[in-house]
Amino acid sequence: MDDIIYDHYIAIDWAKKNMAIARMTKKSNRITVIDVDSDVTELQIYLKNLKGSKVLVLEETTVAQWLYTELKDHVERIIICDPHRNRLLSEGPKTDKIDACKLVQLLRAGLLKEVYHSADEFLYIRRLVSGYEDLIKAGVRLKNQRSALLRSCGKNGNEKGEVELICESDRYVLSCLNRQISAYENEKKGYLKEFRKLSRKHPQIRHQRSLPGIELKNAVKIVARVVSPHRFPDKGHYLSYAGLIKLERISGGRSYGKKEPRYSRQLKSVYKTGVVAAIGGDNPINDYYEYLIREKGYAQHNARNAAARRLAILSLGVFKSGKTFKPSDRRDKKLRKKTKNQACRRCA
């Protein structure tokens, strides 16, 4: 929350059939609340009729992005807040009006945690990535069902194409699964084609692809999830968002261990798989991994985790700089170091 004082503090509890609108002003702690039918046009008129500066808050839901896009031009600021943090809403009786009243109190007190939203061109990329991941999950489920069916009929489970089965019902189910898997593969090719188009259009994706272990799909996922690297104050916040560090719990001068933050599982998967792909290659991530194992005595899993953090930091740096990662600089340094060492040995 910023330090700006607004004339109107507005909270909305939006549902399919109704919306509760609570409002406070900078001069009064009195809350006015109304509960009316859900209508975004009427809501825009309501906001337009309020004179002075306005800040609006609503909770992160499936319609939050749509409301953000529709209302952003009618207020000075919109805050999409994290409902997980709003524990106050769980106390006492619960109605839409009560929820809106509590939400506007949290807004005015500056106690809300904002969820990042934007109305730019990256919205299309985010929706495309979301659809792709849903498709992959559905495809994995279909292939697992096919494998389970074949194994239940005494087969290996890895057979391709049509397989002769004794039971007629099994043959029918197998043919249905084969058709669905074929459709899944075609849809997957369509998504990859769109990803290649996006890579040609957006330099941010090409910059991410220049990193070791980051291929096309993961580069698109990074850009779709991060959108703007400048929303992270430092690398520590980004590593926490990516789930690559744990947060320490200290009270009374005593440590009570560490806990995982609430993080993006998508980003964590991208950097973890990226490190696995980079290890064994001629790149700085593999150099760092080998250094940790040979010089620092790290276990392999700890070295992989540290390398994943290094890859995430490089990814954030590339995003902020707007430039392609250049491993040639590293090779030049290694060559100079090798030449220097050889010269020292000759002198000795």
PLM segments and residue spans:
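Phosphate- and other anionic-substrate recognition elements at nucleic-acid/protein interfaces
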Residues: 1-165, 280, 296, 302
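Non-catalytic, well-ordered alpha-helical scaffold segments
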Residues: 65, 98-101, 122, 126-129, ...
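Amphipathic alpha-helical segments in well-ordered regions
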Residues: 70, 149, 270, 274, ...
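Short helix-capping/linker segments at secondary-structure and domain boundaries
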Residues: 110-113, 142, 228-231, 278-284, ...
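Glycine-rich, often acidic, oxyanion-interacting loops/wings at catalytic, nucleic-acid
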Residues: 129-207
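Phosphate-backbone recognition surface of nucleic-acid-processing proteins
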Residues: 210, 216, 221-300
